């Protein structure tokens, strides 16, 4: 790790809003849960009852 390398906290932020909390990182999605709920259907995820 060099002096310019981002920390884990800086590296993992929501790609849509820039938030650091409530991230969905599975499959390298990196969206906060609110953004994921809005975009999940467009990304091909299906909601099951």
From Swiss-Prot:
Keywords: Ribonucleoprotein, Ribosomal protein, RNA-binding, rRNA-binding
GO terms, molecular function: rRNA binding; structural constituent of ribosome; zinc ion binding
A Pfam family hit: Ribosomal_S14
GO cellular component entries: cytosolic small ribosomal subunit
Database matches in InterPro entries: Ribosomal_uS14 (IPR001209), Ribosomal_uS14_arc (IPR023676), RIbosomal_uS14_euk_arc (IPR039744), Ribosomal_uS14_sf (IPR043140)
Record carries keyword Ribosomal protein: yes
Protein name in UniProt: Small ribosomal subunit protein uS14B
Taxonomy of the source species: Archaea, Methanobacteriati, Methanobacteriota, Stenosarchaea group, Halobacteria
């Amino acid at each position: 790790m060099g002096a310019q390398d981002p920390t884990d906290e800086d590296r993992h932020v929501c790609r849509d809003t820039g938030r650091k909390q409530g991230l969905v990182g599975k499959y390298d999605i990196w969206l906060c849960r609110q953004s994921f709920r809005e975009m999940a259907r467009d990304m091909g995820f299906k909601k099951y009852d």
